[in-house]
Amino acid sequence: MIKTLMGSIRDYMKVTVATPLLVLGEVLCEMLIPFITANLIDAIKDGATVAEMLPTAGFLVLIALTSLAFGAAAGVTCSHASCGFAKNLRHDLFYKIQTFSFANIDEFSSSSLVTRLTTDINNVQQAFMMIIRIAVRAPLVLIFAFTMAFIMGGSVAMVYLVIIPLLGFGLFFIIFKVRPIFSRVFHKYDALNESVEENVTGMRVVKSYVREDFEKEKFATAARDVQMDFTRAEKLLAFNNPMMNICVNGAFVVIIYLGSKLIITSQGTLFDVGQLSSTFTYGFQILMSLMQLSMIFVMVTMADESAHRIAEVLAAEPTIADPAEPVLEVADGSIDFDHVSFKYSKHAKRQALDDIDLHITSGETIGIIGGTGSAKSTLVNLIARLYDTTEGAVRVGGVDVRDYDLDALRHQVAMVLQKNVLFSGTIAENLRWGDPNATDEEVREAAHLACADEFVDGFPKGYDTWIEQGGSNVSGGQKQRLCIARALLRRPKILILDDSTSAVDTKTDAKIRAGLASYLPNTTKLIIAQRISSVQDADRIIVMEGGRIAQIGNHEELLKTSEIYRETFTSQNKMTAEGEGAVEADTEASATQAQTQEGGEAHE
């Protein structure tokens, strides 16, 4: 884990190494200050003049200023190192996530990945900053102060030998109890972020179903779980400072008593006021170093779980990766499913797809229909290798998709997914995801073919209109048409429309299909739809049921051979006829009412 994370230091290695060296210089200077101060006290006691003490006092000021300079420099380098490390770690983690397949994302969940990119990296950054500075400083101060206390205090400083083991035992006991709590709390952070993510992205649904109170309670429960675990941890950690203060202050009382008694009994020959003062000062430094060590242990304990979670992502191998010698060119848009079976998890009991044997020629238009959960989307996801098959093989252009360079394959397989996603930026910028080098004319042509120009031209800024995050400022049908235009700009060999016209009317749907046929005549098209009218002109139509191909044929053939297809077609035609009848009746009633009000023929 440590080796994995330390790889993110890279170009900040110099400042990372410089920080402990500067801290060492700071500590050495600090250790000299009580020693020089003791000599000044003894000089004053012996009646030395100001002139005699000036060299020692000047040296003391010089050492103090040098210590300050070392400390300030260490602070600067520490900040550069920790912030740079966090920046690199975020970059490495985000870059790793970009290589993940859908299966990897399913394993970690998007909310958990967000927590790791934010909260967990912040925790590791804080721990790293403490490790390269305070974790170096505290042990050095403890060792040097302990040594100097024995040099200056002799037997009086033996008290620290009793106190330090007691404090160490207490500290490790607290950490032993706190660590599993911190381990739990970060998993609960995932649940908290998931609640926020679901609520924000689904805000319109929440409000339309008046579920604000339910969502508030759900969020409050997740927040309360985090609070309760943190409170348990803080209750244990609260014992740390009182325990330390009691032990160290008790040690000070014993040192004052023993030191004063020794000064009085020996009349300053064995122990004097200067030695007592320096022993006391070194004791205070020991106290501060112990408190800093306890802070480090607490922070590292908290960050340890975060570090494991980050390392877990960095160490994860993408389930889908490029082969050693990838094929870089897709010959054509032919697709072959060779007895393909697939399940989303190796632990799943049933197959999502079962023994699919299908052959599609290049340029063919294939319609796919089926009930909810019939694995229509799963089938087409395998073509772009968003998932790998469990059994069998999928071939594009006669080559197994696992043998292609992923970028080369996906550049020739354009998908308009069931969930339409737009990104923050202008309409033109979103469309150019299909082709970054597309001219303005090509962008407008793709929008026209997708019937998106009908509403884009109505915006004051046209194609420079800003799209909010997730496309929240455009309707569902508008999003679908923009996503189709984006896919068209790629001019792929295979175009997949996964229920991508469900939010547009049948007239617009027909115009889009006509545009696709004329614009990409040689492109293989797979159209998943719920409306049979969207696929009835396809060369072949696949009827999916329970992860298998139930029937395949053209529209006329399926009306004769497939009961599912025939019933769906009849039902949809009936609903369409009833809808048109209702519209006509409503139109006639409106016209009659208008004529009556105006004193027209209907009134007569």
Residue ranges, per PLM feature:
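Hydrophobic alpha-helical transmembrane segments of ABC transporter permease domains
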Residues: 2, 10, 21, 25, ...
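Transmembrane helix-loop-helix hairpins at lipid-water interfaces of multipass membrane proteins
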Residues: 10, 16-73, 77, 150-155, ...
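An intracellular "coupling" helix at the cytosolic face of ABC transporter transmembrane type-1 domains
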Residues: 11, 99-103, 119-128, 132, ...
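Alpha-helical transmembrane segments of multi-pass membrane proteins
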Residues: 14-16, 22, 63-82, 133-140, ...
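Juxtamembrane helix-loop junctions of ABC transporter transmembrane domains
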Residues: 21-22, 29-42, 63-110, 114, ...
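Helix-loop-helix
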Residues: 46-58, 148-162, 171, 232-309, ...
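ABC-type nucleotide-binding domain
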Residues: 328-604
